[in-house]
């Protein structure tokens, strides 16, 4: 590594650290959960406000900015190539808050070297880190071969329609990386499968059932209101019972986490469904439906639905049920699966429908196939070599179950800044969970990695 450059970057980061943290706090302060579309805000007022704040921060750094019709925006640096450009892409929308927070999710806190708040890790902290990488390049006066855009998306957590809009109306970058996953470099993503398991109109024992705040997150709380006498019910682990009106409120208490990494989570919906079935708290229509839903919750590897499989690049399939709710007398259970190359959306649909039987209907199926980029391609090598030189590691590219913006671009990967092996503090939680946490030192290290990686990408013939 160029030692002079290394020293310049270290001095720059030290000089800008406090302002960088203030900028993350300013962005975290914007509640950017997807809302109702309105004029000038296709994904609601919150994501639009977060986009405005991002572009305001970038402009304050002296970067050129552009709002792409309120779907997406970017901060940019000019380059000599009139056609090709490099890009980073983060997102400034966030998942719903959920339960279990010990403080206001939109007021960033600092504790023992960690940032706490919704979006500090996913993906507002990384968004600000990329802006500071571009700020360094601008202040140092680099004459770039390729222009660079730091894209800011506003619809990543739900449908990624923002990047679809961008790619329909703007040219795609020659190469793009998204700081929305783990280091070192993710060169492949599992396929994405989503659907709803829907009941017939029940009119039975279950008055209400609800749980979860996002389709792509394992819920830590769920409940059902049923017509029964509490004296007839048995206690069960992670279940509480409360009289409510003429019935009983049954609450399940689990452990939340991301759909792509469900290991170690406990799905509260599954706890409630099992309790209802084990205690006969359902009529025949409800029982048949809940038995089908139980197959979903039986295993995060998909064994209950008969969709389990694994391959070399990606490992095993995962599946979770993120939300359950009632609407017009029907029960809806969402499902989110991340699948390897040994299956596909059509095959999974057939297998799941066969497993569900006649008591439940599979609706609103969506599927996106896996993607994979060879690890020895020049851009991948530029990223992985930079990471290893900065950290002193000998890490290799990896694949994952998370779905990022990378799959939407012709040539893209995800590139940090999470560290999967770094244990969370007792007071901190994961992405999509309560008390979302990000380590300050690793975020600052990511700024250095992104600066050097962008300079190396500038040297590649795309």
Regions found by a protein language model. Give the residues of each.
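Zn-dependent metallopeptidase/amidohydrolase metal-coordination segment
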Residues: 12, 385-389, 393-460
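Midchain, well-structured core segments that form catalytic/ion-binding scaffolds
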Residues: 157, 164-341
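Acidic, glycine-rich active-site loops and adjacent beta-strand->loop/helix elements
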Residues: 92-94, 148-159, 179-184, 213, ...
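Active-site metal-coordination/substrate-binding segment of hydrolases
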Residues: 83-152, 158, 171, 428-442
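Acidic/His- and Gly-rich active-site-bordering loop/insert found
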Residues: 2-118, 142-144
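Acidic-glycine-rich active-site phosphate/pyrophosphate-binding loop
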Residues: 95-110, 192-193, 198-199, 242-252, ...
């Amino acid at each position: 590594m160029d030692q002079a450059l290394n020293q310049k970057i270290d001095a720059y980061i030290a000089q800008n650290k406090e302002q960088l943290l203030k900028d993350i706090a300013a962005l975290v302060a914007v509640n950017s959960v997807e809302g109702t579309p309105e004029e000038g805000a296709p994904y609601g007022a919150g994501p639009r406000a977060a986009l405005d704040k991002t572009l305001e921060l970038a402009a304050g750094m002296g970067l050129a900015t552009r709002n792409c019709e309120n779907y997406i925006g970017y901060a940019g640096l000019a380059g000599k190539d009139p056609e090709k450009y490099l890009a980073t892409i983060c997102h400034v929308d966030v998942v719903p808050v959920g339960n279990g927070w010990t403080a206001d999710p939109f007021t960033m806190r600092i504790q023992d070297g960690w940032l706490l708040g919704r979006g500090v890790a996913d993906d507002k902290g990384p968004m600000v880190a990329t802006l500071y990488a571009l700020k360094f390049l601008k202040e140092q006066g680099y004459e770039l071969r390729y222009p660079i855009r730091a894209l800011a998306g506003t619809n990543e957590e739900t449908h990624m329609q923002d990047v679809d809009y961008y790619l329909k109306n703007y040219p795609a970058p020659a190469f793009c990386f998204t700081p929305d996953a783990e280091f070192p470099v993710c060169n492949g993503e599992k396929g994405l499968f989503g659907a709803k398991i829907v009941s017939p109109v029940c009119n039975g024992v279950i008055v209400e059932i609800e749980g979860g705040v996002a389709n792509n997150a394992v819920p830590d709380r769920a409940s059902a209101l049923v017509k029964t006498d509490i004296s007839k019910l048995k206690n069960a682990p992670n279940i509480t019972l409360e009289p409510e009106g003429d019935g009983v409120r049954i609450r399940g208490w689990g452990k939340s986490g991301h759909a792509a990494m469900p290991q170690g989570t406990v799905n509260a919906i599954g706890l409630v469904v099992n309790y209802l079935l084990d205690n006969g708290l359902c009529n025949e229509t409800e029982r048949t439906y809940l038995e089908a839903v139980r197959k979903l919750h039986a295993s995060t590897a998909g064994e209950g639905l008969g969709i389990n499989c694994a391959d070399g690049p990606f490992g095993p399939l995962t599946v979770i049920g993120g939300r359950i709710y009632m609407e017009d007398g029907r029960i809806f259970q969402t499902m989110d699966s991340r699948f390897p190359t040994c299956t596909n959306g059509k095959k999974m649909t057939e297998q799941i429908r066969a497993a569900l039987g006649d008591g439940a209907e599979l609706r609103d199926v969506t599927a996106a196939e896996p993607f994979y980029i060879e690890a020895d391609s020049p851009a991948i090598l530029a990223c992985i070599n930079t990471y290893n030189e900065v950290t002193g590691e000998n890490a290799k590219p990896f694949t994952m179950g998370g779905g990022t913006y990378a799959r939407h671009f012709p040539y893209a990967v995800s590139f940090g800044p999470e560290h999967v092996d770094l244990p969370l503090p007792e007071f901190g939680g994961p992405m999509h969970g309560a008390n979302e946490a990000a380590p300050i030192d690793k975020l600052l290290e990511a700024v250095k990695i992104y600066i050097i990686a962008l300079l190396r990408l500038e040297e590649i013939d795309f």
